[in-house]
Amino acid sequence: MKDVIVIKIGGVAAQKLSTKFIKQMQAWIAAGKKIVVVHGGGLVINQLMKERQLPTRKVKGLRVTAKSDLPIIEQALLGQVGRTLTQELNDSDIESLQLVSHLGKTVSADFIDKDLYGYVGDVTAIQTAYLEQLLAEDIVPVLASLGENSSGDLLNINADYLAAAVASSLQAEKLILMTDIEGVLEDKKVLPQLLTSQVSKKIQTGVIKGGMIPKIESAVQTVLSGVGQVLIGDNLLTGTLIAEG
């Protein structure tokens, strides 16, 4: 869809939206842009797990999720982060709706590797009808990084992967992956642009590592699927632009 911008909010930004962020969203909406927000909630999940003296473990940048962890993750994403983000947007006159009952119907997923990651899913399909309906009504959908498989199991999904899938399914003009760092760093400097052909080598040499790996991988897939631009950074306008080449 022309004029659609998908924004993934993670890290500190997911806990409190800045005035600059709100003003940029308002400016885009005034210019006729349609916006979808996808969010994670890793910091809140970590805190809730710590309070319950439960371990946090990641493999290749993805959170290992036991079935018993799911209520905690659901509480963090739906009960805290998503609810707060939606309230902040609505309080700023940006009409928004948190997807709760519609989330499982919108995001279909399946286990990535149950033995390795537990209840962690990869997106198999995005049902766009409800999202398109909200966008047509100038409402910002707010999606937590959760989905359901064909058996109705709730699965934890990396928010970067989900945002990429949403952007690809809607054929958005832009995907923005917001994080706590300025972009992809090499020698302590932000790379203004990263070509898809350069990514494998950057991972092999350790320039791209940890939680940045799924971000970059999802960005590459999104660019190759036809989405116009993918930006990774700590704000809505600057960072590392992922481009095909």
What are these regions (language model features)?
Residues 1-245:
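C-terminal catalytic "cap/lid" subdomain
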